[in-house]
Amino acid sequence: MEQKYLLQPGKLTIETMRQVHRRHVPITLAPDSFERIHSAEQTVRDVITQGRTVYGINTGFGLLANTKIEVDELELLQRSIVLSHAAGIGTLMSASTVRLLMLLKINSLARGYSGIRLIVIEALIALYNHQVYPAIPEKGSVGASGDLAPLAHMSAVLLGEGEVIYQGNQISAEKGLMIAGLQPISLAPKEGLALLNGTQASTAFALQGLFYAENALTSSIAIGALSVDAALGSRVPFNERIHIVRGHQAQIDVATGFRTLLQESEIGKSHGGCEKVQDPYSLRCQPQVMGACLQQMRFAKQILVTEANGVSDNPIVFSESDDVLSGGNFHAETVAMAADMLAIALAEIGALSERRMALLIDSSLSGLPPFLVDNGGVNSGFMIAQVTSAALASENKSYAHPASIDSLPTSANQEDHVSMATFAGRRLRDIFDNVAGILAIEWLAASQGIDFRFPLKTSTQLQSVHALMRSKVTFYDKDRYFSPDIEQAKLLITRHSLSDLVQQDIQLL
């Protein structure tokens, strides 16, 4: 049996979240969290017995917050909010996204500030551990008041409503509960709202985008280094002293990655005394551009790790003082802005890759055969592959427009400013998909260029990068049906084959 990860509420690391995104990691809740969970639950009970009126416990929601609910309707109130808020539409979230979302929700609830019973948290853990994933539509949240619709679809399963995905099949929530050894739950006061309020969907999407960006940047450094050799680029721009005097650590780290990958290359040594003074920016300024992207990724990581471990419920239960305080921690503006930074970084990684690929097919810049193929004219080589790359890079410019500057009032103007964090995070997948295609095309081109430099060899590390490509796609000695080769190369990127190959040479996050 696979060992379970001991979840200490509020102490999730980026490494754990990365693992959960890539595969199923069973969890168990640290017993020392139980007391705080029980204390917050008792505070909610006290509110009811004392006859106090507290938002979310015995009132309506949103614009109806001033409507008091009688005691005999409190259970119905919590059930109703879950069912009415399960209004999402569109494609269902992937299993990896739902895993992250559930982990983050469990982590937040187990902090003991939501007033929810341990039995409800344990039910979520049971679903998660049995890989019974709620069927959650991707669209329907504006990132304030939390991710209501997505989390309602998750929570409805606990009531025996909605559907789940189990072993790739979509089945009823009732069957899913049986698989996890559960019965439908009747929610106690505040529990429905506690399940729904929170930024976990937005944060899961943004974290997923961070992992995509990490993969893209690692792959881009490896492919960019291969392009340097294919184009007979200079090593001087990667000299450590250049980057140290500027002082940006991320730029220094990216330059270190390039030096590591390019060291001891026969191709590099072959033109050390050439008269060419400077390379175009797409080769020469890679540490500066990719370093800037890495800076944004590191900043986004800090924000998202904090958010993943924070409490984004409302109201918040402070059992030590018997207070239940209403605020706005559900507003995901910080997540939206982090996702916007990642969108810009991802788009720039793709934009720079497209320029490097364009350089390689231009014989006047690279010294390689035009469009990287012999018998040009009869053969068009990589001519239209570069057009595809340009189309993808241009599309990403629209995707990278900041989502956080948009807002649209909801709930009859009670919720009059929202973050759009869910879309901000979700569109990162589409940007990455385009970037992976751009990088795949450059990798094909750079590998072709390396072959044209034979018998000179690139570095040992980059020979491995070249060999990985050639294990799937052969040399272009003449024109052939091109699209399948791009898809093969793209899979090597999206499935982490390339980033896993070079990750020990390139330390990023």
UniProtKB/Swiss-Prot annotation:
Q: What is its main location?
A: cytoplasm
Query: Which InterPro entries does the protein's record reference?
Result: Aromatic_Lyase (IPR001106), Fumarase/histidase_N (IPR024083), HutH (IPR005921), L-Aspartase-like (IPR008948), Phe/His_NH3-lyase_AS (IPR022313)
Q: Name one GO cellular component term.
A: cytoplasm
The UniProt record lists the EC number as 4.3.1.3
- Location of 2,3-didehydroalanine (Ser) modifications: 145
Q: Which GO terms describe its molecular function?
A: histidine ammonia-lyase activity
Tell me which positions the record assigns to the signal sequence: none
Q: What is its subcellular localisation? A: Cytoplasm
Q: Which GO terms describe its biological process?
A: L-histidine catabolic process to glutamate and formamide; L-histidine catabolic process to glutamate and formate
Q: Where is this cross-link: 5-imidazolinone (Ala-Gly)?
A: 144-146
Q: Which UniProt keywords apply?
A: Cytoplasm, Histidine metabolism, Lyase
Reactions the enzyme catalyzes: L-histidine = trans-urocanate + NH4(+)
- Write down the top EC class of this protein: lyase
Q: In which pathway does it act?
A: Amino-acid degradation; L-histidine degradation into L-glutamate; N-formimidoyl-L-glutamate from L-histidine: step 1/3
SUPFAM superfamilies linked to this entry: L-aspartase-like (SSF48557)
Processing after translation: Contains an active site 4-methylidene-imidazol-5-one (MIO), which is formed autocatalytically by cyclization and dehydration of residues Ala-Ser-Gly.
Q: Which family does it belong to?
A: Belongs to the PAL/histidase family.
Protein name (database record): Histidine ammonia-lyase
